[in-house]
Amino acid sequence: MKKIFAWVLVAALLLPFAALAQAPNDEMKIPYTVDMSPEDGADSVERLGDHKNSPYFCQLDFYNMESTDTLTILTNFKTQQQTSEWSCGVSSVLMILEWFDKRGDHNEETLGAMRDVGNKPGATSLKQALQMFEGVGGFDTFSTFDVEGEVYETFTLEFVRETLKEGKPIMIGWNDWGGHWQVIIGYDTMGTETEQDDVIIVADSYDTTDHNQDGYGVYPAERFYYNFTFYNFFPEEELNDMVFIVATPKE
């Protein structure tokens, strides 16, 4: 009887620790301070699609990953899942502010209000994304609007690698999800001369499909590059092709 009691006591003591061991590690997450749309957004399904030891997706610790001779990554880049169906651009700006320790009290709501349409639900154009950096203040930006000549001659995969080596994330808008903003935070050449096997690592505010909602995603670099367009989502003057922003704090 004493042995049974002892085992029950041990089990009771260990149960909380077992639960902690199975809980997802969210050290990479920026805390939520607002919910733009409680009924939807990627945050509304937070971790519900996770599958530990998924046979289909590798689950790597991108948050603590460090650069190597082939990989360039922004170690400890934090992520957040967007709290509405339309605020991927707003969330991407938020994550960049966090990276540079410039987030302060800003959240999706305060940043979205800086767009010329305010927080009216709707996709964020390149111009509106820049408006948020301007509204926060203290940032220099280089974007598709600033490129002279053909954008593809400036925004190359080499440009991505070199920008990351400078510690600068790259905000990109392309046709993922039919139109989506993400932030490039890593690039691996895989140690070969060809770019065919290169991969990019992104901070993704709608990371619901890879069985680990940590806010990171991986894409074949060339496949991303040849799909780097919003198509005709925005008016022509707003730009749709190879839309990007490199924002850095002013010195």
Each language-model region and where it sits:
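Noncatalytic regulatory segments and standalone regulatory/sensor domains
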Residues: 26-36, 187-251
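Active-site-adjacent structural segments surrounding the nucleophilic cysteine of cysteine proteases
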Residues: 22-123, 197, 231-236, 247-251
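C-terminal segment of classical bacterial N-terminal signal peptides
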Residues: 14-20
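Extracytoplasmic/secreted envelope proteins and their assembly/folding machinery
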Residues: 85, 89-97, 108, 126-130, ...
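Active-site-adjacent substructure of cysteine-protease-like catalytic cores
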Residues: 149-205
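Solvent-exposed loop/turn segments at secondary-structure junctions
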Residues: 83-87, 94-95, 102-104, 116-125, ...
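Positively charged n-region of N-terminal signal peptides that target proteins for export
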Residues: 1-4
